[in-house]
Amino acid sequence: MPFPMEVLQASSLSFPLLRRHSRNNLINKFRNPTLPRIDIPRQNIDLKTFAATTPTVACPPSDPEIIPEKKEDKFDWYENWYPVATVCDLDKRRPHGRKVIGIDVVVWWDRKENAWKVFDDTCPHRLAPLSEGRIDQWGRLQCVYHGWCFDGVGACKFIPQAPHDGPPVETSKKACVKGVYPSCVRNGIVWFWPNSDPKYKDIYLTNKPHYIPELDDPSFTCTTITREVPYGYEILAENLMDPSHVPYAHYGILELEKVKESSKRDREGGHEMEISVGTIDVNGFSAKHVSADYYFVPPYVYYGRITPNAATKTKDATLPVVPEEKTAMIVFYCIPVTPGYSRLIYAGARNFAVQIDRFVPRWITHMSHNLIFDSDLFLLHVEEQKLKDLDWHKSCYIPTKADGQVVAFRRWLNKYGGTQVDWRNNFTPALPPTPSREQLFDRYWSHTAECSSCSVACKRLNALEIGLQAMSLVFVAMAAAVSAPATRYSMVAMAVLSFLASKWLSHFIHKTFYNHGYDHAFV
């Protein structure tokens, strides 16, 4: 999983720090820049500086300051907005099923109210999933098990099995959807409040999701990707806050910083870092690394604002990622799904090289993003499995200061978040067993199927593959029909080329949209 800075580079087309292994030449051609600026939500942040020396320092990270806990300072996991899906990946013609913090929800477009709605994904009749239904000709959400229909407030409007001259059974409260959640759209994302109590009906008026203006700024270009990963929220969040894994877990894919050859201690170029972590309280914390300021806004947002300045250079490395006088923003929405599974929505924006995104298809940029996800996916899954019965603070040896943000997150989680996500008896904390590597590295169900760009590209490339196979057969038939040797040889050559092209394309489709895998030993 990429640290914020690396994702900035992973989606860049021309920055010198971006690298790809030679076997990924296609990706190398289409890398796409990312990201913008954010208004800092907190002022007057008290920072304690970590002078981090990753390779050699043998002392533990300095403890960030923690504000003394007040009785009301416990974090409530269900008193917050949660991102459900990016609007660009939702189809208004059908309902969409998602699971967030253990809650199964259905997201659908109510054309009467011109708004996205989020319901509990359960029909009150026989508990069938509404997300498997359809939007009927009157714009109602229809359960396809028995045809019951619901409006935008969850009221039942039609029960086909009810007699015309009988009692209006559809007006009963028991016929209504049990969970109708407050929802809104902000920064191009559909959000929901995970409590259907009527007292929260107008919660948006007093409590809005965290807003990042740059993502809606027309002077910035913005790219997004959503990926479900086979490890939990805690592992996902701490990995995004860890810059020191980038040269190793993502070697050959990208570089976090440009390290001087004279300063390299190994091939990958791990080096000392300077990280500052601010005061930790129930509202999260801030940190500074090189020329970027980062903010953790519980429970889901971790974002960074990158603005080059004189402090960009360190004695061992430089960070020429963003042009002078320009700004880039990287935003991560970390969404708990179930124990052992989480979802990441990444949004990157920048106010330079904005024309590139207009010419590079979105699915091309997702190729490099997905490769980054894959490169440390297995490491993080196994790490979580090993930590499931252990105390993180006692089991992990943290001798250097490069892990400052990771330690800060774990301290926040322990002090304010109850040590883990509150699943409210929906799940036990036990993790699911480890599936096969092929299932772990699945791209289709974890991304392609729910991505509007990649799903369309996958269908079109599959059609092209079939077309190439058909062309191969046509050329064979033409070769058999002609008598001129030169023409026959040409037809045979075209048949062979078409067949080989179809085989190559089949391999490309499989690795890009279905399953890629990753082997660090030969990178």
Curated annotation (Swiss-Prot):
One of its GO terms (cellular component) is chloroplast membrane. The chain crosses the membrane at residues 466-486, 489-509. Fe cation binds at H245, H250. The record marks N239 as: Plays a role in the stabilization of the metal coordination. A motif (Redox-active motif) lies at residues 451-454. Residues 81-192 form the Rieske domain. Pfam families: PaO (PF08417), Rieske (PF00355). CDD domains: Rieske_RO_Alpha_PaO. Glandular trichome-specific expression in leaves. Pathway: Flavonoid metabolism. It comes from the Eukaryota. It catalyses: salvigenin + 2 reduced [2Fe-2S]-[ferredoxin] + O2 + 2 H(+) = 8-hydroxysalvigenin + 2 oxidized [2Fe-2S]-[ferredoxin] + H2O. Its cofactor is [2Fe-2S] cluster. Binds 1 [2Fe-2S] cluster per subunit. Keywords: 2Fe-2S, Chloroplast, Cytoplasm, Iron, Iron-sulfur, Membrane, Metal-binding, Oxidoreductase, Plastid, Transit peptide, Transmembrane, Transmembrane helix. SUPFAM superfamilies: Bet v1-like, ISP domain. Residues 1-50 form a transit peptide. Rieske-type, PAO-family oxygenase involved in the biosynthesis of polymethoxylated flavonoids natural products such as nevadensin and salvigenin, aroma compounds which contribute to the flavor of sweet basil, and exhibit pharmacological activities such as anti-allergic, anti-oxidant, antibacterial, anti-proliferative, and anti-inflammatory effects. Catalyzes the 8-hydroxylation of salvigenin (SALV) to produce 8-hydroxysalvigenin (8-OH-SALV). Can also use cirsimaritin (CIRM) as substrate with low efficiency. This is Flavonoid 8-hydroxylase 1, chloroplastic. It comes from Ocimum basilicum (Sweet basil). The lineage of its organism: Eukaryota, Viridiplantae, Streptophyta, Embryophyta, Tracheophyta. The gene is F8H-1.
